[in-house]
Amino acid sequence: MAKNFDAGVWQQKIDTTQGSKKMPVILEAIRQADEEEEHYYRLFFRYLYAYEATFHDDPPKAMPVAIEFSTIFEQYPDVLGPDGGEMYVMIMQMAIDPIVSLPQIPFEQWQGMIEQYYKLVKRYNLGHRTYWWQMCQFYVYLDKKKAYELFERFWKTGRDSMSDCRTCDRCHAIRMHLLIDDEEGANEMAKPIKSRRMWFCHDTPHLMHRDYIEYYMNKGNAKAAKPYAYELKGMGHRDKHDLSYMGAVIRCMTYFEPQIALQFLEQGMEWVIGIWDCKLAYDFYKSAWVLMHHLSKTQETISIKMPPNFALKNDSDIYNIVDLENHYYDTVKSIADSFDARNGTDSYNENFKLAMMEPKIIE
């Protein structure tokens, strides 16, 4: 090992660094491993970076390091030992997963990338179930019927070491049943999660709560969404990764406890500006518009602390609510238009229209 590179020191730095400061530390570890041509750690730290981006930060940031990982791994396929193939498939999965959330990547490019990913799946005979979920989650915005057919392929395919946890899989099933308005099927899938008879990972039961909130709010039934929002508000605001969960809480709490919605908005604004993941941004900004639109009916201004890079930032942090409402509308509409242009559908704009409707049932 090169004397200028101490992997143990870097691992300790990474382990003891929390929050948004961790990603730059891992990048510096990658840079030094590259300089010293420590190929094991060039790969290992890239894997750590992709994992951190995927589960605690901005998922698309996993993509560049995953491509670099692929290049290095193909040159040095044995350096990671017997687990190398699994790490390779996993990091490429983390690179494929965010594409659905990046409207600037054309559908045809996604098709090419998912085909290459499937070749990797077959090469190592790992991740077949996950492959079908990747296909499914993209087609949700293109063709709901085909998306559900792909989900059925996913559900019937055997699990392996690449699979999400069983609770995540059930959350995926809940989402797909709600997508086709099969509330009874979703509720059946949700039973062991609601009774807490399953192990929970970083994203569960958050995914279930978010999808039920969105489903009921889209139906105009804030009363039915309320218990899920109260559950989610206590768990879903840890970091950038949670912006979609925060958006769901804001949207529902607007009609029950707008002060809580404002607290979530203020916290999330620190994370959402400049984020690569456009779906996280859409979910958050959509609900920010809902909140401002609702508040504009009863007051003209609002005091809220905004980050320095907010487009309408002023020294007093007192804002005209209609100005905020218009700003969020323009932001959401721009994101929705970009997704729909890429997907060749109107699913995002139709989703925004549902959010713009006042709930019919509140209490």
Give the predicted meaning of each segment.
Residues 224-310:
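Active-site/pore-lining binding-face segments in mid-to-C-terminal subdomains
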Residues 51, 137, 175, 214, ...:
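Residue-level recognition of tetratricopeptide repeat
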Residues 7-15, 28-31, 40-58, 84-100, ...:
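Non-membrane alpha-helical segments in proteins
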Residues 1-10, 40-44, 87-94, 124-133, ...:
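Generic helix N-cap/helix-start motif at coil->alpha-helix transitions
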Residues 115-188, 195-196, 206:
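Solenoidal tandem-repeat scaffolds enriched in leucines and small polar residues
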Residues 270-363:
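C-terminal non-catalytic interaction modules
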Residues 15-28, 58-75, 102-116, 139-154, ...:
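Helix-turn-helix repeat elements of alpha-solenoid scaffolds
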Residues 31-39, 70-79, 117-126, 152-164, ...:
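Solenoid-like repeat scaffolds
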